[in-house]
Amino acid sequence: MTTAFMTTDEVAQLRASDCMSCAGVDCTVADSGPVLEEFYQTTPRYNYQGGVTGKFWAKVHEVVDILNSSNEWPFEPLEVSRDRKTLWDGHHRSNAAILAGCDKPIPVEEW
C-alpha cells in the first residue's frame, strides 16, 4: 500500500467500483452519483445513521460542508487501484470533492 495524492479532476475520472459491483454500471466517479443514489434507495448503509436507505446526496453534502471549512483534506485517504484507474473506497468523499470544487490535494492509498 502506497500513500500518494491526486487532484479532484483525477479522482473524477476514476472508474467507480461501487457502481460496477452494486449496480452493474461501468462509470466514472464524476458520473456515479445518480447510480449510487438509486442503489441506496433500497439498500441501507450500515455505517450511516444506523442503516438508513436513501440519503446518498445528504451524506455527500455533509462531507462538502466539512471540506469547505477545512484548510486541508480532513478525511482518511481514498483507496484506489495501483494503476490509479479505479476507486475502491471513498465514493461519498469523492463526489463531495467534485461538488465542492476541492482544490486541496486528495490523499489516496494505492492497493
Curated annotation (Swiss-Prot):
Origin superkingdom: Viruses
**Protein name according to UniProt:** Gene 81 protein
Could you read off the lineage of the organism from its UniProt record? Viruses, Duplodnaviria, Heunggongvirae, Uroviricota, Caudoviricetes
Q: Coding gene?
A: 81
